[in-house]
């Protein structure tokens, strides 16, 4: 039986002709039978693709041959092309949508003026030395099933909400404290940390490689607790059998890490449900009434 894998990677680097890169990436994925999502902009690439292991390896090798993408940090996980409904390769103003393409400055070394990168072991050293504030760089719902202990979780539905959230003043008291931003694979914090630095946060760090790299090293024996939300059919993954379940069913409060869409076709709001509540259309509905109904 063929072995399948999913890869996640990004690169912030000047791309002179994003449309040409889009055509090349699509042709490369089609050649190797891969599916997934790839975004390309003048500032780089953001990709998650899956397929047969040998095909994914060939794709990664070819992608790394492009000068701007020589040094991409490729994160591997279990999964396959079946975890993605199709192949999507698009050119966008941003490879991660903060709604601030004019604020981001990128050169051949990556994002200019971002937070200091920390390897997982360096994060532990920093935590031992200072009173660190963890700042979640993901959508708020992702933190319902997993986050760093005692992390600040901004009230954002999408990454586009972060600028208004930062400009609201509610985090100004943190501007003189050491802040470690983190996200799934590191890309959102590349942008978020630079936005925070520009807004006067004096000591900003970012977890290099994101939660994925941290989890690979420390599993569930470190500062992370819970499951990691992922944007494909898997919905979430765990780093070990010792993973703690911190999510709660929106209907009954039972422990769960499983997200489901509301059964109301006019709503479809994504919420946490335990297996029992998800099994019936009567309980697979928003507990407080559907906001879209």
Curated annotation (Swiss-Prot):
Enzyme Commission number(s) from the entry: 1.14.-.-
Classification via Pfam families: Rhodanese, Rhodanese_C, UPF0176_N
Alphabetic keyword roster: Oxidoreductase, tRNA processing
The Rhodanese domain, residue ranges: 128-223
Active site positions, chain numbering: 183 (cysteine persulfide intermediate)
GO biological process, one term: tRNA modification
Record's catalysed reaction(s): uridine(34) in tRNA + AH2 + O2 = 5-hydroxyuridine(34) in tRNA + A + H2O
Gene Ontology MF annotations: oxidoreductase activity, acting on paired donors, with incorporation or reduction of molecular oxygen
Matches recorded under Gene3D superfamilies: 3.30.70.100, Rhodanese-like domain
Broadest EC class assigned to this enzyme: oxidoreductase
Keyword Secreted: no
Domain of life: Bacteria
Job of this protein: Catalyzes oxygen-dependent 5-hydroxyuridine (ho5U) modification at position 34 in tRNAs.
Family named by the database record: Belongs to the TrhO family.
NCBIfam families membership: PRK00142.1-2
Protein name: tRNA uridine(34) hydroxylase
Native source organism of the sequence: Renibacterium salmoninarum (strain ATCC 33209 / DSM 20767 / JCM 11484 / NBRC 15589 / NCIMB 2235)
